[in-house]
Amino acid sequence: MLLAIDCGNTNTVFSLWDGTRFVATWRTSTEWQRTADQYYVWLRTLMQFQKLEVEITDVIISSTVPRVVFNLRVFADRYFNTRPLVVGKPDCLLPVDVRVDEGTQVGPDRLVNTVAGFDLFGGDLIMVDFGTATTFDVVDTDGAYVGGVIAPGVNLSLEALHQAAAALPHVDITKPQSVVGTNTVACMQSGVFWGYVGLVREICERIKAERARDMRVISTGGLAPLFQQTEALFDAYQEDLTMHGLTVIYKYNKETE
């Protein structure tokens, strides 16, 4: 069975797959100090709680936090006796081309999303991922990754407002009932929510104009459903896009061994 690990700046997700069949998933905070033994105890406890007695034979890792990769490698080797595939490393092949100035600088999560998007929707895509950063990744007609845009994440923007202005409280993001807020919280929520609606729409329109073609816009990430319901910003929402991409990359590497 395959264990796919998606390590982001905020959270790390572990998912079990039996071929293309999803089995289970768990989420924990990303902490670079966490040891291989701690990963195993945490994962084993959750598997036992769900009465999952399975043999993990393969591991694939995508990590935007380089410092955690070493301990995840040790975790895979020590407890599952397997050498994990790590997206972005030379021995992990991708089924799509990367056509940018510095391919090694592209975040692994963005490459994985490109693979997943092309597998599910074909080419000519703009992949919008609402994570710690809000990223826009452009997928060419043949599935190649050809660049993108990085903007501050929604929650990061809210936190920056709270940290930088003493009078502004910490608030959660939600769709406001009106654009004009009548209290501080509503004003902040309106500014961030509608500001990001405008940001997404403008960036996507400029990408389409620059590439002189119609492109489908696919959203993913924790806050994507909140924006998915707003003014037809996206052509589709895909939950667990990164995990799907990891399974595609794993299968591709197995087939090319």
UniProtKB/Swiss-Prot annotation:
ATP binds at D6, C7, G8, N9, T10, N11, T12, V13, T132. One of its GO terms (biological process) is coenzyme A biosynthetic process. It is found in: Cytoplasm. This is Type III pantothenate kinase. The active site is at D109 (proton acceptor). Homodimer. The gene is coaX. A monovalent cation. Ammonium or potassium. K(+) binds at D129. The lineage of its organism: Bacteria, Pseudomonadati, Pseudomonadota, Alphaproteobacteria, Rhodobacterales. It catalyses: (R)-pantothenate + ATP = (R)-4'-phosphopantothenate + ADP + H(+).
